[in-house]
Regions:
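Short beta-strand His + acidic residue motifs that chelate non-heme Fe in jelly-roll/DSBH
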Residues: 62-63, 79, 85-91, 97-99
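Double-stranded beta-helix
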Residues: 90-136
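A short glycine-rich, His/Asp/Glu-containing loop-to-beta-strand
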Residues: 4-43, 49-50
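Short acidic-glycine-tyrosine-enriched beta hairpin
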Residues: 3, 18-20, 66-84
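Glycine- and acidic-residue-biased ligand/ion/polar-headgroup-sensing regions
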Residues: 48-60, 65
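Short beta-strand segments
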Residues: 41-43, 64-69
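A generic "binding-loop/recognition-motif" signal
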Residues: 48, 67, 83-84, 93, ...
Length: 136
């Protein structure tokens, strides 16, 4: 029998790893200055992975398919696999949230953050390698 994984207060940490079935990470966004929204993630989909957010502080707007929803502190959003989605902080106030994802999505995010050059072609290839698709 394996032991449970316990993390200190997440505050920017990750619970789980690419070796687990799912990963929980606490993320923060500083807020959006006036003007068009600054997407935290580009419009994309995961063919075989669900993804969810639980908002701890602030507000996120999530585009799920053709619908936009606003999620305030205490609410959550689940995006089913195969559904185009993106999200952003519509406020100038910071947002703090938990991102609940599969190990595959976690590895995708790690690979994106490790990229030296984020060209559209390179990003599309990383998404494709993780059974996902970059849509914009």
């Amino acid at each position: 029998m394996t032991s449970p994984i316990v993390a200190p207060p997440l505050a920017g940490n990750v619970l789980g790893s690419g070796e687990n079935d799912f990963v929980v990470a606490e993320w923060r966004d500083p807020g959006t200055p006036a003007g068009p929204p600054r997407l935290i993630a580009p419009l994309h989909l995961h063919r075989n992975d669900d993804e969810a957010w639980y908002i701890l502080e602030g507000t996120l707007r999530v585009r799920v398919g053709n619908e936009e929803v606003e999620a305030r502190a205490g609410s959550g959003v689940l995006v089913p696999r195969g559904t185009p989605h993106t999200y952003w902080n519509p406020s100038s106030e910071p947002a703090r949230y938990l991102l609940v994802m599969s190990a595959n999505v976690y590895r995708l995010i790690q690979e994106i953050h490790a990229m030296k050059e984020r060209t559209p072609a390179a990003l599309r290839a990383v998404f494709q390698n993780r059974d996902s698709e970059l849509l914009e």
